[in-house]
Amino acid sequence: MRLRNGTVATALVFVTSFLTLSWYTTWQNGKEKLIAYQREFLALKERLRVAEHRISQRSSELNTIVQQFRRAGAETNGNNTIKLLKELTSKKSLQVPSIYYHLPHLLQNERSLQPAVQIGSGRTGVSIVMGIPTVKREVKSYLIETLHSLIDNLYPEEKLDCVIVVFIGETDLDYVHSVVANLEKEFSREISSGLLEVISPPESYYPDLTNLKETFGDSKERVRWRTKQNLDYCFLMMYAQEKGIYYIQLEDDIIVKQNYFNTIKNFALQLSSEEWMILEFSQLGFIGKMFQAPDLALVVEFILMFYKEKPIDWLLDHILWVKVCNPEKDAKHCDRQKANLRIRFRPSLFQHVGLHSSLSGKIQKLTDKDYMKPLLLKIHVNPPAEVSTSLKVYQGHTLEKTYMGEDFFWAITPTAGDYILFKFDKPVNVESYLFHSGNQEHPGDILLNTTVEVLPLKSDSLEISKETKDKRLEDGYFRIGKFEYGVAEGIVDPGLNPISAFRLSVIQNSAVWAILNEIHIKKVTS
């Protein structure tokens, strides 16, 4: 009897375990499918946004043409052809400066903006376009190795969702055709499938680069090199802008990390509700800088206005300054505003490996120090804010860097009364918050006995629950949460919005140091 009961009990345990495992597996699969659907929805949303932008452009152009035809038809039907011709020749409409204003020599040849060489199937409608400019190098070319690194680290389905455009910035057609021949031999399958395209500009695209003004202490040769480089970037961007949702600028002497494509795409989709302009996946120069396709027209136009004046990375920073910086505010305020348009992903996904520069005689031992670093902080886009703390910072791991996604915050032993303050530049409607302390190298350096508090813009007539009202402090802040096991997260009572500031308050002395490696103050999305 005991044996039978034991057998029944064993069977019940087995059945229960099996059902539990089956339920968990089903739940986990369902969760993964939901995440996948959410990503696909965000991707579709981005495609629709880009399509809407392009349709709007085409609609405006077509409307202008239709109006001209209607007017011409009406005038002709009234037997006023001569009068119409006189009007057209005597009256000139106001003109907005175009590419021909900045590069007037292009008017001398109607093919100046058409690739002299174009290899590939012309794939469009992808998520990411990767642009790689390359020129003749005196010592060694790294192009083949770069392409192998990019292509070999793509999964089959990813190869269908991107296009790699190699821009050969040379007008010597013999050299261009020799590069094309090498690429066709090495990557014939990728070219025929549409994954890889190769283009080169016509000789008439370039202006006279012999009499450029020497600036910033650069030699005449370097000024010519950087000026031509700006023009190369512009041609490549103009060619790429109609092909996909995002455009990422690469170089011909890099290697990449595994799973780079999926990482880039998911990071961009996570930020789809934010008004970013540049996502950075490398800290070096122009490598790994990604734009949204509709923004490329603005980038190209700005570069062409100043292509002879400054290098590309300086010009990019000027674009951001023009867009968001207030001349009446200080540099810190400007940096905070720019940080919302220029968002850095860490660790870097691209590493520079070229030793010999495309500039003749230049040796450059540039490497991205973040390429092999473990991820010690998690990056989010937070509302622009002035940050401050009473805590003693350790070795330059400042709160400002953490809030801007550059580094984790590390402070020496917190004591009762210490605080961390985030004062928003403008009041913000906040949906939720997340603060995570400690990291994988120092998991014990966490915030303990610390509360989360918010300061509403309006302290009176708040439509909030009695429970929330009871958490009001003497200085007008409301205590809405606390750290548990090093983490504080929660939903903000909508009645408290808009919020002027967040504050983390230490209420008891701590026995350990504190690291803050994740800050996410999530705005309400419209």
From Swiss-Prot:
Q: Which residues lie on this side of the membrane: Cytoplasmic?
A: 1-6
Q: Which class of enzymes does this protein belong to?
A: transferase
Reported regulation of activity = Inhibited by UDP.
Q: In which pathway does it act?
A: Protein modification; protein glycosylation
The SS bond pairs are none
| InterPro entries linked to this entry | Glyco_transf_54 (IPR006759), MGAT4_A/B/C_C (IPR056576)
Q: Modified residue Phosphoserine is at which positions? A: S465
Give the GO molecular function terms.
Answer: acetylglucosaminyltransferase activity; alanine-glyoxylate transaminase activity; alpha-1,3-mannosylglycoprotein 4-beta-N-acetylglucosaminyltransferase activity; glycosyltransferase activity; metal ion binding; protein homodimerization activity
* Segments crossing the lipid bilayer: 7-27
**GO process terms (BP):** glyoxylate metabolic process; N-glycan processing; protein glycosylation; protein N-linked glycosylation
Q: Reaction catalysed?
A: N(4)-{beta-D-GlcNAc-(1->2)-alpha-D-Man-(1->3)-[beta-D-GlcNAc-(1->2)-alpha-D-Man-(1->6)]-beta-D-Man-(1->4)-beta-D-GlcNAc-(1->4)-beta-D-GlcNAc}-L-asparaginyl-[protein] + UDP-N-acetyl-alpha-D-glucosamine = N(4)-{beta-D-GlcNAc-(1->2)-[beta-D-GlcNAc-(1->4)]-alpha-D-Man-(1->3)-[beta-D-GlcNAc-(1->2)-alpha-D-Man-(1->6)]-beta-D-Man-(1->4)-beta-D-GlcNAc-(1->4)-beta-D-GlcNAc}-L-asparaginyl-[protein] + UDP + H(+); an N(4)-{beta-D-GlcNAc-(1->2)-alpha-D-Man-(1->3)-[alpha-D-Man-(1->6)]-beta-D-Man-(1->4)-beta-D-GlcNAc-(1->4)-beta-D-GlcNAc}-L-asparaginyl-[protein] + UDP-N-acetyl-alpha-D-glucosamine = an N(4)-{beta-D-GlcNAc-(1->2)-[beta-D-GlcNAc-(1->4)]-alpha-D-Man-(1->3)-[alpha-D-Man-(1->6)]-beta-D-Man-(1->4)-beta-D-GlcNAc-(1->4)-beta-D-GlcNAc}-L-asparaginyl-[protein] + UDP + H(+); an N(4)-{beta-D-GlcNAc-(1->2)-alpha-D-Man-(1->3)-[beta-D-GlcNAc-(1->2)-[beta-D-GlcNAc-(1->6)]-alpha-D-Man-(1->6)]-beta-D-Man-(1->4)-beta-D-GlcNAc-(1->4)-beta-D-GlcNAc}-L-asparaginyl-[protein] + UDP-N-acetyl-alpha-D-glucosamine = an N(4)-{beta-D-GlcNAc-(1->2)-[beta-D-GlcNAc-(1->4)]-alpha-D-Man-(1->3)-[beta-D-GlcNAc-(1->2)-[beta-D-GlcNAc-(1->6)]-alpha-D-Man-(1->6)]-beta-D-Man-(1->4)-beta-D-GlcNAc-(1->4)-beta-D-GlcNAc}-L-asparaginyl-[protein] + UDP + H(+); an N(4)-{beta-D-GlcNAc-(1->2)-alpha-D-Man-(1->3)-[beta-D-GlcNAc-(1->2)-alpha-D-Man-(1->6)]-beta-D-Man-(1->4)-beta-D-GlcNAc-(1->4)-[alpha-L-Fuc-(1->6)]-beta-D-GlcNAc}-L-asparaginyl-[protein] + UDP-N-acetyl-alpha-D-glucosamine = N(4)-{beta-D-GlcNAc-(1->2)-[beta-D-GlcNAc-(1->4)]-alpha-D-Man-(1->3)-[beta-D-GlcNAc-(1->2)-alpha-D-Man-(1->6)]-beta-D-Man-(1->4)-beta-D-GlcNAc-(1->4)-[alpha-L-Fuc-(1->6)]-beta-D-GlcNAc}-asparaginyl-[protein] + UDP + H(+)
User: Which residue spans adopt a coiled-coil conformation according to this UniProt entry?
Assistant: 28-63
- In its keyword annotation, does this UniProt entry include Transmembrane? yes
| Keyword Transcription regulation set for record | no
Q: Could you tell me what this protein does?
A: Glycosyltransferase that catalyze the transfer of GlcNAc from UDP-GlcNAc to the GlcNAcbeta1-2Manalpha1-3 arm of the core structure of N-linked glycans through a beta1-4 linkage and participates in the production of tri- and tetra-antennary N-linked sugar chains. Involved in glucose transport by mediating SLC2A2/GLUT2 glycosylation, thereby controlling cell-surface expression of SLC2A2 in pancreatic beta cells.
Protein name as it appears in the record:
Alpha-1,3-mannosyl-glycoprotein 4-beta-N-acetylglucosaminyltransferase A
Whose protein is this, by species? Rattus norvegicus
